[in-house]
Amino acid sequence: MTIRFFLIVFFSIFLSLNINSSEGLVNKLSQQEWSFKGLTGTFDRSALQRGYKVYREVCSGCHSMKLLYYRDLLDIGFSVEEVKAIASEYTVIDGPDDEGEMFERSAKPSDKFVGPYANDQEARASNNSAYPPDLSVIVKAKKNGVDYLYNLLLGYSDPPEETSISDGMYYNKWTDNNQIAMPQPLYDGSVDYDDGTENSLTQLSKDLVTFLAWSAEPELEERKSLGIKVILFFIVIGILI
């Protein structure tokens, strides 16, 4: 009785979460098929690596990812040598040394991602007083974050007639008041993919959002795998009793 009750409650919550996720803004958004969605969803490693390249070549010039370490890139399919090479392209401040002095060195896989700015003040000064948000968990900032970010990246256009846009702002139909401080970051062909994948705006955007979804929940696959095992366990126990 207890186990059957648990199963009923579990699946009720699961269905409720899926129903709730379809409410509100998502009804207006263009919804994409994401490999990592659903009970058995997983991340596409090729898409993750392409998405990291988009972040690295475009987004990292303004946006940090303070919660990630270079060694985390091993989880998306990069080899140890590739991760070492990626990290070595960045410089970090370390120390103090034996003489009490701080010093610069090349980053290592054990270091966090190096951000574009030394501090928040420099970030604001470089971006018309607007602070570029950290992207580590940006998909969690809004409900249906992956679809929202995807649509945001595609939502830039010239403003409609009689629409006033403040100085230093850009029109985007998915933002509050249809204005955003960030200029359009991606265009067709902005990044060349090493694997020959089409580098259209839609593909670049989808790959970037996939990478950002992983950075927000790197444990997602492990959690889903454990969840399935738990569900199967209780189903079997429920049948046996």
Predicted regions and their residues:
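Extended, hydrophilic extramembrane loops/domains of integral membrane proteins
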Residues: 174-176, 180-217
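The canonical Cys-X-X-Cys-His
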Residues: 55-66, 208
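Membrane-proximal low-complexity regions enriched in glycine and acidic/polar residues
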Residues: 91-180
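Juxtamembrane/start-of-transmembrane alpha-helix segments at the extracytoplasmic/lumenal side
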Residues: 216-234
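Active-site-surrounding "flap" and adjacent substrate/cofactor-binding loops of secreted or lumenal enzymes
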Residues: 75-100
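Post-cleavage N-terminal segment of exported redox proteins
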Residues: 2-42, 214, 241
